Amino acid sequence: MVRLRTLVRAIAAASVLTSGMAHGLGLGEITLKSALNQPLDAEIELLEVRDLGSGEVIPSLASPEEFSKAGVDRLYYLTDLKFTPVVKPNGKSVIRVTSSKPVQEPYLNFLVQVLWPNGRLLREYTVLLDPPLYSPQAAASAPQAPVSAPRATGAPRTPQAPAPVRTTAPAGSDTYRTVSNDTLWEIAQRNRTDRVSVPQAMLAFQELNPGAFVDGNINRLKSGQVLRIPTEQQMLERSPREALSQVQAQNQSWRGSRNPAAGTAGARQLDATQRNAAGSAPSKVDATDNLRLVSGEGKASKGADKGGKGDSKAIADTLAVTKESLDSTRRENEELQSRMQDLQSQLDKLQKLIQLKDAQLAKLQGQLGAEGQGAAQPNAALPDASQPNAAAQAPAQPGTPAAAAPTPAPAGEAPAAPAQPPVAPPPAPVAEKPPAPAVPAPAPVQAAEQPAPSFLDELLANPLWLAVIGGSALLALLVLLMILSRRNAQKEKEEAQAFAADAGEEQEDALDLGKDGFDDLTLDEPEPQVAAAAPQVEKTTAQTSDALGEADIYIAYGRFNQAAELLQNAIYDEPQRTDLRLKLMEVYAEMGDREGFARQENELREIGGAQPQVEQLKSRYPAMVAVAAVAGLAGAKLAQDELDSFSLDDLSLDDSGHAAKPDAAGQDLDDAFDLSLDDLGGGDLGSDDVQADLKSDSGALDDLTLDSDLDLAASTAADKPVDDLDFGLDFAELAETPSQPKHDDLGDFSLDLDAPEDKLSDDDFLLSLNDEVPAAAPANNEFTLDTEAAEEPALSLPDDFDLSLADEPTEPAAPEKGEDSFAAQLDEVSAQLDELASNLDEPKSAAPSFSAEDAAVASALDGDADDDFDFLSGADEAATKLDLARAYIDMGDSEGARDILDEVLAEGNDSQQAEARELLERLA
């Protein structure tokens, strides 16, 4: 599914790439229509508007995040800007940028965001605001008018001041002559390229024309100056940010010095306009200023007044006029010098261009000469053709300084004269170019160098083909990735299968049972098994309802731990599902977890209905079969340990006594001794549970059933202290002369381990198999012990009381008529023990303790734990080891099988030893 989505996305991307011919909305340049200290009025050109309406184009100021990404400060006064789209169907469409308040900042730098149906546009704009109609020359020429206007002396000087301003003409294609209303911002904006910002172009103009600015400030451009236009490379010498910071510094410097200068200029302009506005104005000013000194009345009153006073006034008037003329001459000289510098710089630039052209021609000659002599002849005409052009340009420029040299003499008319010669020389070389036949020669040479466009050039020039090729390459790449992913998935699957195949071999090493491997299987105090609490870890839950499907995916990739966790969680939710448990058994088999395998097998056995599938799993994973043998041996050892710690305190028996002879010393215990472990597992051993038939001619153990072979031996050993097992019987005191048999409840028969130990001899308590049961004694199913309360206050078992069928009594008592029946019953006990040995995996629950309320507390005797109940001795343990050795042989573990067979040779009987030797011969 993921691959399909990736393919769909790739096709969508390819379709987007193929639509390269679609046109989109664009933003052009900004045109400023306002000045400093005025409300902003500007227009941004809209490109490729086509059928869009004004409602579909939504311009606005960019968000603060976009400003921060672009590295531009979003100042507060920018929020006053309003953007209004003006979409014209057949005309020029623009975005009007206006503000409601006057803009007092010398420049504005902001980001414009335009939203339209097909996308979004974002562009940065920088606007430099100049003062309205500011010109330094106008303020400088104003004082000349009032000095010369009132009389004939100033008449010829009035038209001379604006002469250099109005006689403007372009000096060439690489230069520009300023006029009174020009600003450096507009000049730089017209002559820059798209790669160059306006501040970069302004600083390049200032660097090439330092004399065209007052005090070296870009805001004080002189009018009538010939500016050299910088190239794009010169404009790009500074970064946009560096150029913007320098422009800001010059703007701040200009603003700091603008107020006093403007005040002085304004005062001078105001004074001049008052004097030229009306004829009556000079009469009011004459009382205090120079009008009286330059008036004609000074000559008339020269003879009438006293001589010293009239002469001083005339001299002062002449001195003032002379100073004014000197000041005017000085300014004209400075202006002429600046023009001379501009011409000289222009001449230097032309010479550099000529050198560059010569170098290019020389390079072309070298290239053509290497190709052949035929191509060298047309190339030879190129320098000849270019030399007249260079010669025509060179004399034209020296001619201008020659004509300008005599200009300082006519102080007033000199500025107009040098302005004409630079204009006249350019047409002269144009007229001389047609006679030169070699000039058009470079065109064929250049055309010959450009070969016909190749297929690659046509391909690169066609965006549609580029989009198709790009989409095809992308699709091919996606197909390749899909093939690689499938190959990797197949490889992982093969690795998982190989891992599953080798799992059996890897698990054989984990099964290491040494010679003493069963010595640790001891349980001193067996407790009921309680399921362990699930660990508090993050559960791997099924993403879908099919937990088996997800588990199969994990198994295919070899992630057995995650599969096991997933199945365990699913079993926790649905414990009755056998298919989940079977899958979990398979995962445990792959992981080599024998305990988990056996645990799930037991769970399935309890649930039922899945035994054929379990057998199939066992056949598929023979390594797990050894678990059964190990479990059987472990169960046998566990049962032995439980019987080692067996005490009569754990039994609850009902004893019922019948009529006994008052003078009897004791009763035969084997008359009614019935100990069945099958009944012990059920709870109380009452009258219904323990069944015994006491007959007059035989006393036997009817249903003596144990978990292993039981050896019963008569104990005749000497008295010795009890070490491990306290085997005590608490008997109730009987009446001195009971007339009727008393029915005692064996449920109250208890074993007191804390009772004081009395060391009694064998004579105190004699377990006799020879005493005859009285003929009058009726048969009873109860466990009956008849004691003489008068003679024995407390009875105890002998120290060497051992129920072992393996060892026969060495010195049995003289057999009487009950001895034959006892031997027959021993055979029945052996058969029952064999039957119980096959069901060791189903242990019975522990029997509850019991006590006798009517019996007195008797002292308990301790018995040796090692000799009390030896149920797992002899042939059964050796047979189990033989079964385990066969399982090892089936798994291929020869060393483990050989070790176990050696133990059987040392511990087993003759038949088992013979079978062990046969297996060893097969291994050899």
UniProtKB/Swiss-Prot annotation:
Residues 245-256 have a biased composition (Polar residues). Residues 299-312 have a biased composition (Basic and acidic residues). GO terms for molecular function: structural constituent of nuclear pore. Residues 1-24 form the signal peptide. Residues 140-150, 390-417 have a biased composition (Low complexity). Residues 174-229 form the LysM domain. This is Motility hub protein FimV. The gene is fimV.
